[in-house]
């Protein structure tokens, strides 16, 4: 989600296939987000006259599933911690990396990103889209990933499962969830 944000990121979904060598079977993880709890037919009828919201608004979004997928992968098959797995991404988000042509082109061509001040701040620093090779930073994303690591570290004494769960729960039930809502 750092170097190729259009492919996958902390606010997105994931569909993952795993070969579980021990069980000798393919396992599928479907981390496609669910609709928010209050997104009911009645709510849309009352608030939007029964119309569906535009596809690029929060009203059409789902709860991001990717952090739960990371948790599931690490908890069931992993040996590393969130801290170990996320450290390279945190370093790139905060320190920057040379942006590739594909991501630079996607940013430049995106009208949706330009509609939201928070996206403009990240993707159009100085008011301009980055060019391929420019150093691109996303410190806000780095801070979000650090929060997952902090939550995990706070629960390390309770065991691996509880520590991983604490990171996931901070995203879905803690301050990160409240900031997104």
Residue map of PLM features:
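Noncatalytic scaffold domains of N-terminal-nucleophile
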Residues: 1-181
């Amino acid at each position: 989600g750092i170097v190729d944000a259009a492919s996958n990121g902390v606010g997105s979904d994931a569909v993952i296939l795993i070969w579980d060598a021990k069980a000798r079977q393919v396992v599928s993880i479907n981390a496609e987000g669910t609709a928010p709890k209050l997104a009911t037919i009645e709510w849309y009828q009352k608030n939007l006259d029964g119309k569906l919201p535009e596809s690029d608004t929060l009203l059409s979004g789902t709860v991001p599933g990717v952090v739960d997928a990371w948790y599931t992968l690490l908890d069931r098959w992993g040996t590393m911690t969130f801290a170990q797995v996320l450290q390279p991404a945190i370093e790139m988000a905060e320190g920057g990396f040379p942006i590739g042509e594909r991501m630079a082109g996607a940013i430049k061509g995106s009208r949706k990103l330009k509609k939201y001040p928070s996206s403009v701040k990240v993707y159009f620093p100085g008011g301009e889209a980055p060019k391929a090779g420019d150093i691109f930073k996303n410190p806000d994303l780095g801070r979000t990933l650090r929060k997952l690591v902090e939550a995990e570290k706070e629960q390390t004494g309770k065991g691996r499962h509880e520590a991983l769960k604490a990171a996931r729960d901070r995203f879905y039930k803690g301050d990160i969830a409240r900031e997104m809502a």
